[in-house]
């Protein structure tokens, strides 16, 4: 009798999920789950020391989690101390540390690099430039204040942090290459007239230029251009809750931040050492249209 009751309860739970999914599909025309593969490389980043800007949520947070799973020590940065604390608690590993850092404050870069290295217990091996903000104001309503704020974080801060760290690396002698991963966007490849997408175009161009400039010094630079990702930077996605439907690409769904993290790990690893200056588009086919 107990076995029958357990079976009934189990079936009821499954039916509840089915009905919920049907309701979501009816509301949004999409689906609530998708399958992605997680590769267990086996400590492919063991003992690497990694700095991830904008790591308290979304893509940066998921990259941090995956780095730690692969044996790295990580410092994640952000402007909001509360969000950083929450991220650290969720990751729940001694391999992650946090650093409150507004990357737009150029005069704080040198000091912040020193702080990050102290938290990591040594020199930085990999930089992930992920910090970025979005402002939805479109041309012709963009003000100088909006422009400056977006560019200060997305483009200017990234440039001068990369400059400062690569200058230090160039002066060093090493066997293993250093790595820089720049998080751009597929929006940077389709043309735009508002600051967010324009900064992402900047980043893709900088990635190519730095790839050429820094490779002879043992510094490998690459980038990732995600499509529309299910994070808090996508209010439409958040409004759909678990539903991942997105009509804007051939796969008809949002990307998951974990998928971007899988690609980032590959680019950080020695398996990608012959890839230089490339920005890999991961957008479900959106930019093919």
Give, region by region, the residue ranges found by the protein language model:
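Residue(s) in the substrate-gating loop at a strand-loop-helix junction
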Residues: 185
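Short C-terminal tail/terminal secondary-structure segment
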Residues: 35-37, 190, 265, 276-289
